[in-house]
Swiss-Prot record:
There are at least five different forms arising from glycan heterogeneity. Gene3D superfamilies: Ribonuclease A-like domain. The active site is at 15 (proton acceptor), 107 (proton donor). SUPFAM superfamilies: RNase A-like. This is Amphinase-4. Keywords: Disulfide bond, Endonuclease, Glycoprotein, Hydrolase, Nuclease, Secreted. GO terms for cellular component: extracellular region.
Length: 114
């Protein structure tokens, strides 16, 4: 079994959550020490409420480094504009555009089609 791409491992940790939209809490997640290793609060981050399978499938048959749009919509939560690390939270359901590298998602480009 080939070793998982390091960037994919980081992508999963940063952008994929098994929590439901209703249970998800931006402040709790974004201020987790694992999420802010340097102690700085990130200005914005989008989370995909999904198992890893459907997200990884977006990059099936993607060779090299390429941006791809999902064919299905995902429930998404965006945490943004922290004031002293307190985030506002917005939810939507939409397609996503991600950067794939050799069949693995490695970067979240934007909400919506590429």
């Amino acid at each position: 079994k080939p070793k998982e791409d390091k960037e994919w491992v980081k992508f999963k940790a940063k952008h994929i959550t098994s929590q439901s939209v209703a249970d998800f809490n931006c402040n709790k997640t974004m201020n987790d020490p694992d999420f802010t290793p340097d102690g700085q609060c990130k200005p914005v981050n989008t989370f995909i409420h999904s198992n890893t399978g459907p997200v990884k499938d977006i990059c099936r048959r993607a060779s090299g480094r390429v941006n791809k749009s999902s064919t299905q919509q995902f429930p998404l939560t965006t945490c943004n504009k922290p004031i002293r690390c307190k985030y506002s939270q917005s939810n939507t359901t939409n397609f996503i555009c991600i950067t794939c590298r050799d069949n693995y998602p490695v970067h979240f480009v934007k909400i919506g089609k590429c």
